[in-house]
Curated annotation (Swiss-Prot):
Region of interest called G1, as start-end residue ranges on this chain: 508-515
Keyword annotations of the record: Cytoplasm, GTP-binding, Initiation factor, Nucleotide-binding, Protein biosynthesis
Full protein name: Translation initiation factor IF-2
InterPro entries, alphabetized: EF-G-like_DII (IPR053905), IF2_II (IPR044145), IF2_N (IPR006847), P-loop_NTPase (IPR027417), Small_GTP-bd (IPR005225), T_Tr_GTP-bd_dom (IPR000795), TF_IF2_bacterial-like (IPR000178), TIF_IF2 (IPR015760)
UniProt-recorded Gene Ontology molecular function terms: GTP binding; GTPase activity; translation initiation factor activity
Region (G2): 533-537
PROSITE patterns with a match to the protein in the record: G_TR_2 (PS51722), IF2 (PS01176)
Localization: Cytoplasm
Recorded GO CC terms: cytosol
Organism listed in the record: Solibacter usitatus (strain Ellin6076)
Annotated family: Belongs to the TRAFAC class translation factor GTPase superfamily. Classic translation factor GTPase family. IF-2 subfamily.
Biased composition (Basic and acidic residues): 70-84, 109-120, 379-410
Length: 1001
């Protein structure tokens, strides 16, 4: 079957290709087509007729030439034969075109009336088409033509309903040999009514119609086709005749079987003309169908031509000399009737106006004959067409061009309508879940900011806040431990809460007896083991009193351990403020009060050392009341208990008050939940590795639990209590030493047992990355302002120091203490601080930076000591913080430039001058003030003007050399490198001494 591309057909019809694609489903083409796809010739014929173009006669019947008759065609012919009238004499009639069947729902189309029978005309010889001609359209709403009896020929291709046509008179050459025409279908409309329009459902093919056959007089030399059986016809009286068709060019067709003629038709076969294939064999008709189709029908009333409707193009008329054959469909804005002076089918002349629209420009698609008017908007098309359609896109682009340009104003973020809680290291997926949006929307917001992330990638807290703001949500940033604790607390049951032991922190000034008081309670001797008799570590202990446990935390009282005291106040339930009765309130006592008030915990004052003779407890109460702590016996709410750590006086009363205050607070915990606590202290043990002292505040800590502690992830390998006994479980308010950390945590970090190890490792990596970035930011390139500042501070000396301590808290305290010693003359710079013994890497670092190494309660390793001796590195070891700070101060003083001071000795007056050979000028002088030492320096004053400064060459009394001449004595003085001495000059003796620089004035 011949095919044609949609692009070529669109250019031929002068329409857009997408309009043809939208029309294909209505013609029964359900396949997916594109602009470059091909369609069958029969579909192309329907499209040509739909758009009002003449169908060339050289387009042959594809079903009759290239393909055998299909089963569907056979059924259609059987259906047509079932509606044919009874057999009648065949007669040659004028050629006609197929008619569009009336809708099945139209009642007028179903009424059938018998038509008068006419004698059949003899069959004319069949000729091939010789010339193209316009299709001749039947009246609107006409019924299908009846079919004669006999064998069926190849079916004609289905065509859509053509446009109406003006009837013409029959040609005078009708008597010449011509092609037999099909019988005229009987009119099937009620009288004085407009014929109903044929309505086709979208996506269904138009009803088939027969192909028109031209009946024109053959020209000389024209080759005619073979004989063809005529069809019985019952023309309606007064029906308009069809015009003659233009001869078509010859075309090779496949031989067809000849239909047997009906009654009255000539039975003798016609002789085939030259070039015509042999006729098909004749098949006798079925008697039952002949009898059925030969039944008489009711006559049909003559039909008047329908008046043209607005918006519907009228049927194409015959060509007129001097006018174009194709006049095209009526376009938008074109009048239905041509104006005077305007040629039909041509655009009107517009002098000075714009050019007419291009023929292929987008126009309105006109419906076919009998079809309802199309909707206002182009809603046609196959189901599943992509939207928006091309027309909508073009219309939108035109509107953008035509309407005035407006300044683009970016819409601000939506108003805040909710608040979410985000933790550090939140991922894109977790943020989308909290915002209740899809993750791809969050990723799109990040891509708009130029940030490309994966769905499981962590986000910075500031960036997550900005993204949440774009979705109309405010954020509250909390740590991972706090968020995990909140989720656990929300899920826990109040019935699981049990009473826990109180945590008591002992605070006070140094040497006020804090550790001694705790030793008396624990019946131990911890203070005796402390270096210098002072506490330099924070410790936690558990004491049992009357079947109940009390946890004590001992904090240092030295001024350098402020952060330790602050850390102890944050994890405590009760603060015991120890004040010596013989010393009174001291600066660290006031600091401890401030820490306790900041932590909002109750305070119990223990007035210690009441066994001494000079103890004044009442004076202590007065001083504390001036600071806002009013005793109970004075009408206040602060419990004050006089105690003595040495004689254990008042200790039972102190413990009783601790339990009473704890009962008032109603301290409870849930032992069945995952454990959480606080790191009190951390140290690096040589045999056990990193060890952390943890106070469990809630839950139960067991061996084998995974935990996160700041930027450290680990697993509990072993636990030891305060007495060094290994345990398997630690209940709430229990201090334990935990082994199994990957690295050393910071003192004060939160300790949290986790179940999601992957999430915990992700948080640890995030924190570690942040710490590295912070360290890198400190060592980044300096700015120009910083360079100028360093140039201005070029006179400031710097003392680099490396600190190694036994525990992390001590290293932290030492770093802060030494940095506070810096002033405008000498600056102490701590290059590195760590925990553990002094190793070889510390020595090499000190050698490279010309620093000194300070070890606090640690010793250097063997290879480190050898390296330090080889590299000449100064290593200082200390156990008491007092001695350490004093030595650093001396080192700072030694860095400054020496200061020399002039010390006056005495002066002598020149009374006479002598000149001796081999010696030079000698001045005879008398000492008038002080003394003149021989090794001192001197200056010569003449009229109170210094004329020379130098050293004394020789000092003699008479003929003897002397070391010193005192006041009132005479002597002879010679000066080195100076001989211009005169009578009356003053020789002043002085000495230069080096004076130590005062660093701390």
């Amino acid at each position: 079957m011949k095919k044609i591309r949609i692009n070529e057909l669109a250019r031929e019809l002068e329409v857009k290709a997408h309009e043809i694609l939208e029309r294909l489903p209505e013609l029964g083409v359900t396949e997916k087509k594109t602009h470059s796809s091909s369609i069958d010739e029969d579909v192309a014929i329907k499209l040509r007729q739909y758009y009002g173009q003449d169908v060339p006669d050289y387009v042959h019947d594809p079903n009759a030439v290239d393909e055998p008759a299909t089963e569907a065609h056979e059924e259609r012919h059987e259906h047509e034969e079932a509606h044919e009238p009874a057999a009648a004499p065949k007669a040659a009639v004028e050629p006609e075109t197929p008619v569009a069947p009336a809708p099945e729902a139209a009642p007028a189309a179903k009424e059938e009336r018998p038509a008068p029978e006419e004698p059949a005309r003899p069959m004319a010889p069949i000729r091939p088409p010789l010339a193209s001609g316009r299709p001749i359209h039947p009246p609107v709403g006409a019924t299908p033509p009846p079919r004669p009896e006999g064998p069926r020929a190849a079916p004609a291709p289905p065509l859509p309903p053509p446009a109406p046509q003006v009837p013409h008179a029959p040609s005078p050459a009708a008597s010449s040999p011509a092609m037999p025409a099909r019988p005229e279908p009987p009119a099937h409309h009620p009288p004085s009514q407009t014929p109903p329009a044929a309505v086709f459902a979208p996506g269904r093919p138009a009803p088939p119609s027969a192909k028109p056959l031209p009946t024109t007089t053959p020209r000389p030399g024209q080759v005619l086709s073979g004989p063809r059986q005529p069809f019985p016809s019952s023309p309606a009286p007064g029906a308009p005749q069809r015009p003659q068709a233009i001869p078509r060019p010859p075309q090779q067709v496949r031989p067809e079987s000849q239909r047997p003629s009906g009654p009255g038709a000539p039975s003798a076969p016609q002789r085939p003309l030259a070039g015509q294939p042999a006729a098909r064999p004749v098949v006798p008709p079925r008697p039952d169908l002949v009898a059925k189709l030969s039944a008489p029908r009711a006559p049909v009333m003559p039909q008047q031509p329908a008046a043209p409707r607005p918006g519907v193009p009228k049927a194409p008329s015959a060509p007129v000399p001097g006018q174009p054959i194709y006049r095209g469909p009526i376009r938008p804005g074109q009048p239905m009737v041509a104006k005077p002076g305007v040629r039909p089918g041509m655009p009107p002349s517009r002098p000075g106006g714009p050019r007419p629209q291009h023929p292929t420009s987008r126009g309105r698609i006109e419906p076919g004959m009998g079809a309802p008017p199309p909707p206002a908007e182009p809603s046609r098309g196959r189901p599943g067409d992509r939207r928006p359609v091309r027309q909508q896109r073009e219309r939108t682009e035109e509107e953008k061009i035509l309407r005035p340009q407006r300044r683009h104003v970016e819409a601000g973020p939506p108003p805040i309508s909710r608040e979410i809680t985000i933790s550090e290291g939140i991922t894109v997926k977790e943020l989308s879940e909290k915002l209740d949006v899809k993750a791809n929307l969050v990723m799109k917001k990040l891509m708009d900011r130029g940030i490309f992330v994966a769905i499981n990638q962590t986000l910075d807290g500031k960036l997550a806040t900005e993204v949440a703001r774009d979705f109309g949500a405010s954020t509250a940033t909390v740590s991972y431990e706090v968020e995990a604790m909140q989720s656990v607390e929300e899920a826990q049951d109040t019935t699981d809460l049990e009473r826990r032991a109180p945590v008591v922190t002992i605070m006070g000034h140094v040497d006020h007896g804090k550790t001694s008081l705790l030793d008396a309670i624990r019946e131990a001797n911890v203070a005796g083991r402390e270096a210098g008799g002072i506490t330099q570590h924070i410790g936690a202990y558990q004491v049992e009193m009357k079947g109940r446990k009390i946890v004590f935390i001992d904090t240092p009282g030295h001024e350098a351990f402020t952060r330790m005291r602050s850390r102890g106040a944050k994890v405590t339930d009760i603060v015991i403020l120890v004040v010596a009765a013989d010393d009174g309130v001291m600066p660290q006592t006031l600091e401890a009060i401030d820490h306790a008030k900041a932590a909002a915990v109750p305070i119990i004052v223990a007035i210690n050392k009441i066994d001494k003779a000079d103890a004044q407890p009442e004076r202590i109460k007065q001083q504390l009341s001036d600071r806002g702590l009013l005793p109970e016996d004075w009408g206040g709410d602060v419990v004050m208990v006089p105690v003595s750590a040495r004689t254990q006086q008042g200790l039972p009363d102190l413990l009783e008050m601790i339990l009473l205050v704890a009962d008032m607070q109603d301290l409870k915990a849930n032992p069945s939940r995952p454990a959480m606590g606080t790191v009190i202290e951390a140290q690096l043990d040589r045999g056990r590795g990193p060890v952390a002292t943890v106070l469990v505040r809630n839950g139960t800590l067991s061996v084998g639990d995974f935990f996160i502690c700041g930027a450290v992830f680990g697993k509990v390998r072993a636990m030891l209590n305060d007495r060094g006994t290994q345990i398997r479980k630690a209940e709430p308010s229990t201090p334990v030493e935990v082994l199994g950390l990957d690295s050393l945590p910071e003192a004060g970090d939160d300790f949290q047992v986790v179940t999601d190890t992957a999430k915990a490792k992700q948080i640890v990596n995030f924190r570690d990355q942040r710490q590295k970035e912070a360290a890198l930011a400190k060592s980044s390139r300096i700015t120009l302002e910083q360079l100028h500042q360093q140039m201005r501070e070029g006179e400031v000396k710097e003392l680099p120091v490396i600190i190694k301590a036994d525990v992390g808290g001590s290293a932290e305290v030492l770093k802060e203490t030494l940095e506070k010693l810096s002033n405008d003359k000498v600056k102490v710079r701590v290059i590195h601080s760590g925990v553990g013994a002094i190793n070889e890497s510390d020595i090499l670092l000190a050698s490279a930076s010309n620093a000194i190494v300070i070890g606090f309660n640690v010793r250097p390793e063997r290879n480190a000591a050898a390296t330090a001796e080889q590299e000449k590195v100064d290593v200082r070891l200390h156990t008491i913080i007092y001695n350490l700070t004093d030595e650093i101060k001396r080192a700072m003083s030694g860095l400054l430039a020496p200061v020399f001071k002039e010390v006056y000795r005495g002066k002598a007056e020149v009374r006479e001058t002598f000149r001796i050979s081999k010696v030079g000028a000698v001045a005879g002088c008398q000492v008038i003030d002080g003394s003149i030492p021989r090794d001192s320096e001197c200056r010569v004053l003449r009229d109170n003007i210094v004329v020379h400064t130098g050293k004394i060459g020789s000092l003699r009394r008479f003929k003897d050399d002397v070391s010193e001449v005192k006041i009132g004595m005479e002597c002879g003085i010679t000066l080195a490198n100076f001989a211009d001495l005169k009578q009356g000059d003053i020789i002043e003796a002085f000495a230069t001494e080096r004076v130590a620089t005062e660093v701390f004035a």
